[in-house]
């Protein structure tokens, strides 16, 4: 989610300011990103789920707002707010195990006394696949509002706010020791400033 919807703008601005720095971007789910940071495969990760490894440094960037999505012709399409129990009466399309979105939704279900063993009709590996399946009428889902701006404008999906609301932090994660390259310190400092400057934007 993050790599597709937040990082391009951040890295574009960074590249314009530091044209001599080459950045190699890898996309994975939160579990995969944490593993790559642990193994020093990457220097800096951005994740959307809690990080259990206490040996890593985790810094929150900003809050992300998650919403229920349904196709425009769905029974729930005209609602403004919705309790998660009502949404779970319909076939549910979710991300794969290890995804930050899946982990956050499971935690939300537990906190709201819902069974995490819901009626899952599909497990898919990307936000685009989830959106496509919901658009095709194969079920309902919960996604980051940041991922559906185009679909909302085209009216191929409807977003419904969950009650209570569902938010999660986007966080940077890295090793405690200093970065091997000075450019990584500059990137992290730039990213911190970018998050502060864009904190009020709708995600």
Annotated model-derived regions:
Residues 1-54, 115, 124:
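Central regulatory/effector-binding core of bacterial HTH transcription factors
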Residues 2, 6, 158-201:
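A late-sequence structural motif
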Residues 6, 10, 22, 36, ...:
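Conserved functional loop/turn residues at catalytic and ligand-binding sites
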Residues 31-34, 42, 49-55, 103, ...:
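A ligand-binding cleft/hinge motif common to bilobed small-molecule-binding domains
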Residues 57-67, 119, 148, 153-166:
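Short beta-strand->loop
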Residues 92-112, 181-182, 198-203:
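Secondary-structure junction motif
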């Amino acid at each position: 989610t993050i790599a597709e919807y937040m990082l391009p703008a951040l890295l574009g601005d960074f590249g314009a300011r530091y044209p001599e720095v080459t950045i190699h971007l890898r996309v994975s789910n939160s579990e995969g990103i944490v593993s790559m940071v642990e193994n020093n495969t990457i220097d800096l990760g951005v994740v959307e789920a809690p990080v259990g490894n206490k040996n890593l440094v985790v810094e929150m960037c900003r809050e992300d707002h998650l919403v229920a999505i349904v196709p425009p012709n769905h029974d729930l399409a005209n609602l403004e707010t919705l309790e998660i129990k009502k949404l779970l009466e319909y076939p549910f399309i979710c991300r794969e195990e290890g995804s930050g979105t899946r982990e956050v939704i499971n935690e939300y279900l537990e906190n709201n006394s819902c069974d995490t063993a819901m009626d899952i009709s599909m497990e898919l590996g990307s936000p685009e696949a989830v959106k496509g399946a919901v658009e095709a009428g194969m079920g309902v889902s919960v996604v980051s509002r940041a991922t559906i701006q185009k679909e909302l404008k085209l009216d191929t999906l409807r977003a419904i706010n969950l009650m209570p609301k569902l938010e999660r932090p986007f966080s940077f994660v890295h090793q405690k020791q200093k970065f091997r390259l000075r450019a990584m310190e500059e990137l992290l400092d730039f990213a911190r400033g970018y998050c502060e400057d864009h904190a009020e934007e709708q995600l």
